[in-house]
């Protein structure tokens, strides 16, 4: 029987393992196919495509909003060289950085008040 794991996060998003370690562990455990679907990132795909002893399906988990709901959409067999995808990922990452900066600013104000 063939097994696959099609929803894995690496340390390029909110996972703890490198893409290399994920692939090595998948091979050791007999998986035939995997997809590293990092949040709003395709960086792990450049590492993953170097392996030919396991089927690595290029994937991503895109964040979006619909009617005040945060949604995550999984995409498989993505073209990591697609310029529109690259621009979208860059916008999402820029947005994330801005949110982090805003959170840090608010936390600094709270810490100052507590001092």
Each predicted region: which residue ranges?
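An N-terminally biased module of ancient metal coordination in phosphate/nucleic-acid-related enzymes
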Residues: 1-70
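Extended substrate/RNA-proximal surfaces in nucleic-acid metabolism proteins
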Residues: 51-115
